[in-house]
Amino acid sequence: MLDALEHCGVTHLYVNLGSDHPELIESLAKRAAAGHHPFRVVTCPHENVALTAAQAHAMVSGQPQAVFVHVDVGTQTLGGALHNAFRARVPVFIFAGETPFTLNGELLGSRNRPAQILQDVPDQHSVVRAYVKWSMSVRTGRNIRDLVYRGMQLARSEPCGVVYLSGAREVMSETLDGPAADQAARWPALLPSALRPALAREIAGAVSQARKPVLVTSYFGRRPERVAALVQLAERVGMMVVEESPVYLNFPRSHPLHAGYQAAEVVSDADLILVVDCDVPWINATIRLSESVRIYQIDTDPLKESIPLWHVPAEAFCQVDSALALEQIEAALDHLPNDDPTVAARTRAAATRHVEVEARAKARLQRSAATLNPDSVAACLASLLDDDAIVIDETVTSSMMVLESLPRDKPGTYLASGGSSLGFGGGGSIGARLAAPDRTVVCLTGDGSYLFGVPSAVHIVASRYRAPFLTVIMNNGGWNATKQNLLRLRPDGYAQRDDRLWVGFGQEADLAGIAAAAGGGLALTVREPEQLAPLLRQALEAVRGGRCAVVDVRLPPITLQDP
């Protein structure tokens, strides 16, 4: 198995090992004794940290990594991190042991601990089946390399995703012949698919003739080199680009054609919409589109087959490599002159709107400059970070302010989890830093998200494996997303009247201190606006010196409810 993972380009094993892994440990030790070190093994005290780190590592490097967990219980503890990797379509290889299948010592690896009886469950794979592209149990060690190759082939084929392999100790203890030849090249990922030429011409014609064309995307920028294709097409036709709930940086955010982060503000009067690499371009109940609007869905997964109830009223759903499709569309615009007055008018209108949106954000920042708030924190960071720094955003209800006040322009400098399970930021920052050790990594998170991410385990790992990063906690003392949804549904309800919401956990805890206790990190707390800039500078200096730092920014609490 390790041979095959090495052949497939895996460089890091994020592991939480148990009694099902003695042969893995023995194999790694044997390799080390022979001076063969193809992997960096990162021991993670919690499975959430292992998988979030592997996810972000793949997002930054473009190469899938491997996660090892302990039988059914370790698989379950992956929890929401598995949801995120699945929804983000990130390639990750997961291996879990299975409880031994012999009772009386019939084979090497037979049961020898009471826990192994309790871990014998009817269908371990049912825990992950809804969240993986492929799952398989190793039935003989003789074809385990083929199983790894098969899993990695599927993980890397668009739409990419998580694969899960499991094996019992008896199988993993089988003795095989010496190292096998590298056969990974015989198991390549799918080649990218293109639009039919006639459809490319149709979409190009629709774009060129539209009064207001808009493109909406969330994860087009998952490969940073692709962003240039989107910029080129947008500039060619004067098309506004909306990053709806972005997972990556998809379009330079200071570009005049960047139309913000809420498609609902832009598409209601659009007559042509390209939905490109986006799962949720808008919420149907809160938007009214033009009855004559033309919509094309361009995606590796245009029908969102893993989402039971989903719909975009498109006239064509195009299952293609989106970057290749945009290049085809632009090539089909050869009839459009470079000085077309319609394009110039669209570009001017978009630029005017862009300036207005920026002015609105600046005015909001100025109004609240004397207080601690997400805008002021993000703006302060914007003045301190270099262009190559990677920002991991898990601020949830503050994300819009972070996006507007901490704009990133360089592809590969912004990440989000891609799913809806909180707790990605800490482990994700470790993976990002290990994938890009020369770049600064900054995690922006809420206090709820910070705690979901198991910060004690995060900072143990970050310290041991020299992956320092800065965490900035937007600490409002609770779960603001839950509060906001309550107020939307029950604006005049009883809960709203007396602030009895059961979503607050106060601001008494020393959240930054967890980093100091677990990994020797620098722990700072900001309580006054004038402390913000100097403490953020101090924290960034610590990170540059090889030490994690956590800055706990105390925002106004979302609820004053007593326990």
Locations of regions flagged by a protein language model:
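Active-site diphosphate/adenylate-binding microenvironment
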Residues: 1-9, 16-29, 351-438
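Structural element of the ATP-grasp superfamily
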Residues: 54, 128, 381, 511, ...
